[in-house]
């Protein structure tokens, strides 16, 4: 009997040991999320968090948005918070600005920022200037968002980049996300900001999936407006970009790395207020600078960066003149081959970097 009892107790002890054993719990894995889904998730979380937030624009409700960025929000929040508007940018932008002045937090979607020109008086004269003109008594917490810059085959009237246009205006904050992390963190910060914020998205990036880090999956995740991010560390040259060209810069950096050239790639994230300190610190390390943007060259984002570097402490660290890579100084052509030659490509960035380094 003792032998039998020993046979029984042995497995029981082993089972007890298994029950007491502590297993390692790994952190939740990063998930793949498209830029479209990231913006949608960010808006959803803020709509849920604050009942003063609402979305309006053309086809944003029952149709789920022209680019499906607002998919599912109308079914969840209803007609009073997800509002379809007539095709009248001046009209619905004015309604949104008035709602912001009354204490709500509207998200005003333009089907493309080219159409925001129809509402420029509301954006600049009403939204951007009111806080200053009221001596700080009247905030205008509104987000103007939608696709910006070149798309594919939509020609001159649908392909402009408005980063420099809106970045020129005091009273506005201007953000320009590249990946899903940028998109979610910036839309949430923009909605919570008490100033008018212009969020320049990119139609060609909506369907691109990126890994969303664990911290970005939190409902409390925010990206500070006015802070750039170093996407790739390097020692030979600083390359600064925003929106879709950030990806082109990283591709160029990967190619050049095989040749022994290490590029430091900075994702601006915010156009205004610009994180010039991050750019200066990088230039002081690499001693070379290239800026990349999809907009026109004259009075552009790159021109502003170069001017600020020239006026600041980093200028004395440059070993060569800064070089800009921009869109061509023409209205966007319709033909694909001309369109491709009108916006910066990876080969153009590589050429500019080698030119700056005199290679």
From Swiss-Prot:
Catalytic activity: N(6)-[(R)-lipoyl]-L-lysyl-[protein] + pyruvate + H(+) = N(6)-[(R)-S(8)-acetyldihydrolipoyl]-L-lysyl-[protein] + CO2
Cofactors named for this entry: thiamine diphosphate
SMART domains the record matches: Transket_pyr (SM00861)
Modified residues (N6-acetyllysine): 354
Residues reported in the UniProt entry to bind thiamine diphosphate: 89
Phosphotyrosine: residues bearing it: 67
Record localization: Mitochondrion matrix
Disulfide bonds: none
GO biological process: glucose metabolic process; pyruvate decarboxylation to acetyl-CoA; tricarboxylic acid cycle
Gene Ontology, cellular component aspect: mitochondrial matrix; mitochondrion; pyruvate dehydrogenase complex
Keywords carried by this UniProt record: Acetylation, Carbohydrate metabolism, Glucose metabolism, Metal-binding, Mitochondrion, Oxidoreductase, Phosphoprotein, Potassium, Pyruvate, Thiamine pyrophosphate, Transit peptide, Tricarboxylic acid cycle
Organelle transit peptide: 1-30
Main location, first listed in the record: mitochondrion
PANTHER family: DEHYDROGENASE RELATED (PTHR11624), PYRUVATE DEHYDROGENASE E1 COMPONENT SUBUNIT BETA, MITOCHONDRIAL (PTHR11624:SF96)
Subunit structure, as described in the record: Heterotetramer of two PDHA1 and two PDHB subunits. The heterotetramer interacts with DLAT, and is part of the multimeric pyruvate dehydrogenase complex that contains multiple copies of pyruvate dehydrogenase (E1), dihydrolipoamide acetyltransferase (DLAT, E2) and lipoamide dehydrogenase (DLD, E3). These subunits are bound to an inner core composed of about 48 DLAT and 12 PDHX molecules. Interacts with DLAT.
The protein's name: Pyruvate dehydrogenase E1 component subunit beta, mitochondrial
